[in-house]
């Protein structure tokens, strides 16, 4: 089957689980959304860590202490999102399931909304959100059609 042709769901084996369905070679291009969403999420986490590092360096150069920095709620929240972004990115790359993609999309949406309200940068989080959501929605649409056909 050519890569650019639509998948004829009626030719697929009956009784597949959602994980087996998602893992079919026919959906390799859609699963690529999950891989890229995971990579972008990991990069997003690294950028957050980098920005906290730059902020810490600035504070230390100006004679401040890091105790005050890490007591700030925004810094703690950014550290939490950094860890969550990296962990979810790794899990999405490894598992490539729609559930993981939706979880990552929700987390990134929350992060984007928090960044907007605090005047931060939303570019990378928004990209990860969109990649996760697009991949998960495309697989779920095909999964629902497959379930209707295989009944």
Q: Which residues fall in each region the model found?
A:
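Topology signature of small-to-medium multi-pass alpha-helical membrane proteins
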Residues: 2-151
């Amino acid at each position: 089957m050519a890569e650019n042709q639509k998948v004829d769901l009626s030719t697929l084996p009956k009784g597949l689980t959602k994980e087996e369905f998602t893992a079919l070679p026919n959906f390799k291009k859609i699963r690529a959304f999950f891989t890229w969403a995971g990579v972008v999420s990991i990069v997003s986490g690294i950028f957050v860590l980098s920005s906290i590092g730059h902020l810490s360096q600035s504070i230390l150069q100006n004679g401040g202490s890091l105790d005050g920095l890490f007591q700030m709620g925004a810094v703690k929240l950014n550290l939490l999102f950094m860890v969550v972004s990296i962990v979810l990115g790794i899990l999405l790359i490894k598992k490539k399931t729609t559930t993981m993609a939706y979880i990552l999309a929700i987390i990134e949406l929350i992060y984007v909304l928090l960044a907007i309200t605090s005047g931060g940068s939303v570019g990378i989080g928004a990209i990860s959100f969109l990649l996760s959501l697009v991949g998960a929605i495309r697989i779920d649409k095909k999964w629902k059609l497959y379930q209707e056909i295989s009944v």
